[in-house]
Amino acid sequence: MIGRLTGTLAEKSPPQLLVDVGGVGYEVDVPMSTFYNLPVLGERVTLLTHFVVREDAQLLYGFLTATERATFRQLLKISGVGARTALSILSGLSVADLAQAVSAQEAGRLVKVPGIGKKTAERLLLELKGKLGPDLALPGAVIRNEAQSDIVQALIALGYNEREAAAAIKPLPADVGVSDGIKLALRALGK
């Protein structure tokens, strides 16, 4: 399974990217929320991924935040919602908006997403109720490079949850190294 890609952003054409990792180009489908926050072509990018193996294809879906990927995976568990539909939902609504719509049972917000009809919207509300917790309703930290991704993973390994880890890396400089970043993040978490 491929859980994360770090490489050079070689091409981007909504909703697909080509990420060059060590001379191998990976095609990755992303929601528009991720697409709009990507660096310019030629820059390094780190994407958290979800790998789908089908009879006729192997597909990678990429996200800048762990929150978005977790929501995507939660959507895939719903009967009748495939990867394309889940991607469409996350392109039409932010994670916070989706969580709010589910909490308020607002089918009207979901119906505005292309490909989501009234019945599908009602099924989404029913099956997601109580499953998009408060952590998913909060915007996650955008992981801009491999060091920040490693810092988040280290904090999670030390027992912090994704929300705490994401909050701890937000104030860190983009060019901070892994060991210094972990120290700074731990200091911030200790306050």
Swiss-Prot record:
InterPro entries membership: DNA_helicase_Holl-junc_RuvA_I (IPR013849), Hlx-hairpin-Hlx_DNA-bd_motif (IPR003583), NA-bd_OB-fold (IPR012340), RuvA (IPR000085), RuvA_2-like (IPR010994), RuvA_C (IPR011114), RuvA_C_sf (IPR036267)
Region (Flexible linker), start-end ranges: 138-142
Superkingdom of origin organism: Bacteria
GO terms of biological process kind: DNA recombination; DNA repair
Keywords assigned by UniProt, alphabetized: Cytoplasm, DNA damage, DNA recombination, DNA repair, DNA-binding
Gene3D superfamilies: 5' to 3' exonuclease, C-terminal subdomain, DNA helicase RuvA subunit, C-terminal domain, Nucleic acid-binding proteins
Region (Domain II): 65-138
DNA repair as UniProt keyword: yes
UniProt cross-references to SMART domains, sorted A to Z: HhH1
GO MF annotation terms: ATP binding; four-way junction DNA binding; four-way junction helicase activity
GO cellular-component term (any): Holliday junction resolvase complex
Region (Domain III): 143-191
Protein's job: The RuvA-RuvB-RuvC complex processes Holliday junction (HJ) DNA during genetic recombination and DNA repair, while the RuvA-RuvB complex plays an important role in the rescue of blocked DNA replication forks via replication fork reversal (RFR). RuvA specifically binds to HJ cruciform DNA, conferring on it an open structure. The RuvB hexamer acts as an ATP-dependent pump, pulling dsDNA into and through the RuvAB complex. HJ branch migration allows RuvC to scan DNA until it finds its consensus sequence, where it cleaves and resolves the cruciform DNA.
Complex formation: Homotetramer. Forms an RuvA(8)-RuvB(12)-Holliday junction (HJ) complex. HJ DNA is sandwiched between 2 RuvA tetramers; dsDNA enters through RuvA and exits via RuvB. An RuvB hexamer assembles on each DNA strand where it exits the tetramer. Each RuvB hexamer is contacted by two RuvA subunits (via domain III) on 2 adjacent RuvB subunits; this complex drives branch migration. In the full resolvosome a probable DNA-RuvA(4)-RuvB(12)-RuvC(2) complex forms which resolves the HJ.
NCBIfam families tied to this protein: ruvA (TIGR00084)
Protein name: Holliday junction branch migration complex subunit RuvA
